[in-house]
């Protein structure tokens, strides 16, 4: 919690002190498409049966079936790394709230709501695609191949219900989508190359640390983590680009007790 607070304070200081560009984002038809795709993938994932890993499944696992690139993950297991990955993910996930708060202070609700809406779309799409892929692929997590853990220990871990959700890494995907969203939107909103470099380095560093910790925890193979990083990066970069004002069709107007969303025909 302390590290999260320090990161946000650092970001807030530089946001309030930096020169701001014209706000370039708006709601448009892409907002509808992104929300629909994210929502539909999430609903589709909920319709699929939860993948179950039984003690018989665990006993039948053979590490020799794992490719050499991924095999080292079957020797990893660390509850501490698992917990730490939640912390690093949490820090990078909440960081965009500093920019939303800055927009609220500078320009009022309209810009803050648009920025927050873009971030929610990013999370919805990242999470929906991830959940659907996990339920379709049903790859067993590497820790269940780990012979240093007894069959009983692995059976207890499998009882949590996520033993076959290895591909791909959701923590890594969300961390990278949040990190790239944060840094790329900062570049559009502020003219400060020094802070930009620091922000890219720190946010991508946290996302990379999240992926590494998922590996050390025995939760994911390297290919799971690499895939999550690529997909998260793509979504985190593309969603805000899809909201640049050149494609403006929607306007969100806050009222005293309401919000009005208007569509403009071209």
Model-derived features: positions:
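Generic beta-strand or strand-like secondary-structure segments
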Residues: 93-100, 115, 128, 132
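Membrane-interface helix-boundary motifs at transmembrane edges
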Residues: 23-26, 41, 105-113, 190-193
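N-terminal transmembrane-helix/juxtamembrane module of multi-pass inner/ER membrane proteins
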Residues: 20-96, 137, 141-152
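Structural signal for the C-terminal ends of transmembrane alpha-helices
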Residues: 100-107, 185-187
């Amino acid at each position: 919690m302390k590290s999260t607070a320090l990161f946000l304070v650092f970001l807030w200081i530089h946001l309030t002190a930096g020169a701001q560009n014209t706000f370039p984002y708006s709601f448009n038809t892409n907002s509808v498409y992104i929300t629909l795709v994210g929502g539909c993938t999430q609903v589709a994932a909920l319709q699929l049966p939860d993948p179950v890993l039984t003690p018989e499944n665990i006993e039948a696992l053979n590490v020799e079936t794992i490719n050499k690139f991924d095999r080292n993950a079957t020797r990893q297991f660390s509850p501490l790394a698992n917990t730490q990955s939640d912390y690093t993910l949490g820090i990078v996930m909440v960081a965009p709230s500093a920019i939303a708060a800055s927009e609220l202070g500078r320009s009022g609700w309209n810009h803050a709501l648009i920025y927050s809406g873009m971030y929610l779309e990013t999370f919805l799409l990242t999470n929906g695609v991830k959940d659907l892929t996990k339920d379709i692929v049903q790859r067993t997590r590497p820790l269940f191949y780990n012979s240093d853990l007894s069959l009983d220990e692995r059976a207890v871990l499998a009882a949590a219900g996520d033993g076959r959700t290895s591909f791909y890494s959701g923590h890594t995907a969300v961390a990278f989508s949040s990190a790239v969203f944060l840094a790329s939107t900062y570049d559009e909103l502020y003219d400060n190359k020094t802070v930009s470099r620091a922000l890219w380095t720190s946010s991508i560093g946290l996302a990379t640390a999240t992926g590494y910790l998922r590996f050390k925890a025995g939760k994911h193979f390297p290919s799971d983590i690499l895939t999550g990083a690529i997909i998260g990066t793509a979504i985190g970069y593309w969603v805000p680009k899809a909201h640049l004002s050149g494609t403006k069709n929607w306007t969100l107007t806050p009222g005293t007790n309401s919000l009005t969303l208007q569509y403009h025909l071209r």
